[in-house]
Regions:
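Active-site beta->alpha loop and helix N-cap motifs at the rims of alpha/beta catalytic domains
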Residues: 2-147
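Catalytic alpha/beta core domains of metabolic enzymes, predominantly
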Residues: 128-130, 140-219
């Protein structure tokens, strides 16, 4: 089932297990998925920052995504497809969706500085992967060095109907959640799922501000 703006609950951010020689540890992927399922997660996110995607070539990344997707039959799987080029992003996004992923996740590249650069980048990313693929907007300025204001996030979401979720990981970021939910109340922002990160450190407060759950993990 594809991800929608009504998504909520807990999505575990999965690490990618490796053997000592650098090969992907596929049996450990299966065990990770089984644990996430047993504890009641609603979904799993793979090949994110915690998933160490830059350590893999395109074939390995696709294989990891597919292994998670095929094992996680009762979970919605979100695949991180951020890349330095749109061709690689498109290839992994299409392969992941063909394998049964619920959505993909896209982060801004660290060189983006102005609001126009940020909004244009995501428009081009959607054109590259196809507007039929639901996607998660990753907002993690502490690591990615790209600051997206609530107004910029609103423009990205309104310009790209296939964006169904915000992975919110700003710190401090409570006012950002409040602002986005305020936009929805005044009709300037359509429905959008908001899941938060930061190790769930502020989850109680984030839920009070209108978050729909958490997308986070530990390794």
């Amino acid at each position: 089932m594809k991800l929608t703006s009504q998504a909520s609950g807990t999505f575990a951010i999965a690490p990618t297990p490796f053997h000592d020689d650098g090969r992907i540890d596929e049996s450990s992927i299966d065990r990770l998925v089984d644990v996430y399922t047993e504890v009641g997660c609603n979904g799993v996110t793979v090949l994110g920052i915690l998933g160490e995607a830059p350590k893999m070539d395109s074939a390995e990344a696709a294989a990891v995504a597919t292994r998670f997707i095929k094992r996680a039959t009762s979970l919605q799987t979100v695949v991180g497809v951020s890349a330095s080029g749109f061709a690689a992003m498109r290839g992994l996004a299409r392969a992941s969706m063909d394998a049964g992923a619920a959505a993909v996740m896209i982060a801004p590249t660290p060189n983006l500085r102005t609001d126009d650069q940020i909004t244009t980048y995501f428009k081009q990313a959607v054109e590259a992967i196809g507007d039929d693929i639901p996607w998660v907007l990753q907002d993690y300025p502490l690591t990615l060095s790209v600051v997206m204001t609530p107004a910029v996030i609103r423009k990205i979401v309104m310009d790209n109907p296939s964006c169904v979720m915000l992975k919110h990981e700003d710190w401090p970021g409570l006012e950002k959640i409040t602002a986005l939910r305020g936009f929805q109340k005044d009709g300037s922002l359509r429905p959008l799922s908001i899941l938060t990160g930061n190790g769930a450190t502020f989850l109680d407060f984030e839920m009070e501000r209108g978050a729909d759950g958490a997308m986070t993990g530990y390794a």
